[in-house]
């Protein structure tokens, strides 16, 4: 479990999105992102795949232990939503994916994930940081 850390992030022009986690018991198995306010639709898509045993990381036999939780609300553009999602993936290394080569998610070494995140951070800082009004709030 990530603990009690939750965040709200607002940068630049605003769309609403969220980074969410799917837990089996206290184990974080999946981190994903979703644009829009209706997170229940995305949750029901995951649950349908789990029930049909089509989900790669959660089996239908574990359905009673499955918990869906919003980890971070993002009020920004798509780039920031992806950045926050990659940050959570890098920090908590769920089974679903690892950061490698930008938007390509695949199994990789932890050092590859860290290097990709550092490159993304540098790109973010150089191209966007100076021109944005930033509000970042951690909620416990």
Identify the residue ranges that each predicted region occupies:
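Structure-specific nucleic-acid interaction/processing domains
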Residues: 1-136
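Nuclease-adjacent, charged terminal/linker segments that flank catalytic cores
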Residues: 139-140
């Amino acid at each position: 479990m990530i603990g009690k850390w939750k965040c709200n992030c607002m940068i630049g022009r605003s769309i609403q999105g969220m980074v969410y986690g799917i837990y089996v018991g206290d184990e974080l198995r999946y981190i994903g992102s979703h644009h829009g306010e209706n997170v229940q639709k995305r949750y029901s898509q995951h649950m349908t795949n789990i029930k049909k045993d089509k989900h790669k990381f959660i089996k239908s036999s574990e359905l009673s232990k499955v918990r869906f939780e919003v980890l971070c609300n993002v009020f920004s553009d798509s780039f920031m939503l992806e950045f926050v999602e990659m940050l959570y993936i890098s920090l908590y290394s769920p089974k679903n994916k690892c950061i490698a080569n930008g938007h390509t998610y695949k199994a990789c070494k932890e050092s590859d994930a860290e290097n990709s995140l550092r490159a993304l951070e540098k790109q973010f800082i150089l191209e966007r940081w100076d021109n944005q009004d930033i509000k970042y709030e951690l909620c416990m």
